[in-house]
Amino acid sequence: MENLHGKTVLITGASSGIGAALAREFARRGASLILLARNRQRLEAVRDSCAACGAGAIRLVEADTTDFAAIDAFAPTVEGCLDYLVLNAGISQRSLAVETGEAVDRRVMEVDFFAPVRLTKALYAAGKWDRHTHIAATSSISGLFGFPQRSAYCAAKHALKGFFEALQLEMDMKVTLLFPGRINTPISLSALEADGSAHGKMDPGQAGGMDADACARKCVRGILRGKRQVRVGGKEMISCFIYKWFPGIFFKFAGKASAV
């Protein structure tokens, strides 16, 4: 296992799901962590599990990534230059495109696209990362092609992919885009319905999905190997192959499948 003692990793959305699992995976390698999320109590639980895994120094930051004033104030407080910036915070959606309110479309774009972009720019302006920093951003299999009842989510995750690929080319730096499929996390609980209310239940796809820790192991392994993309999940990942090589089949049957 790679030794990351002396390295600093900032992870957003670190209080649960893939973010918490990524934090533990970096902790096992001895990295120092800056864990950012809205829920202080959950962050403290993740901190304790990371400490037990062998993490170096751990800093907790209770903040909403869409509160740009708070993000701008936070950025200069980061000590030194980050070795890894992991942009993982996100929200999903569960509604038909034509029934989804514009406020929901904007909220999903705000959380899944504009927030990570703003944090990235704020940290750069504060001198907290440079071209030697490795950035990882959590997109989704839905960021590779469309899925039903995920129109805003797909749009945001596609935008995230485009932005960070462009940044990689401009800065000549390492960027890894993470494309998880169905992972057993609580993301569907907070997913937005057409009217903006919370979905409030676990989808079968999530409930039966890959364990978050197993997902994180593959993601961190890919990050440390310098991969540009890490695609991780179960049998649903065959959709990537079908979309690329048999698009006619994909568009005929994908609408009938349960979305990710």
Q: Where are the regions a protein language model picked out?
A:
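Active-site helix of classical SDR
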Residues: 120, 156
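Residue(s) in the substrate-gating loop at a strand-loop-helix junction
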Residues: 140
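SDR active-site lid
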Residues: 172-234
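Substrate-binding pocket helix/loop in short-chain dehydrogenase/reductase
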Residues: 96-107
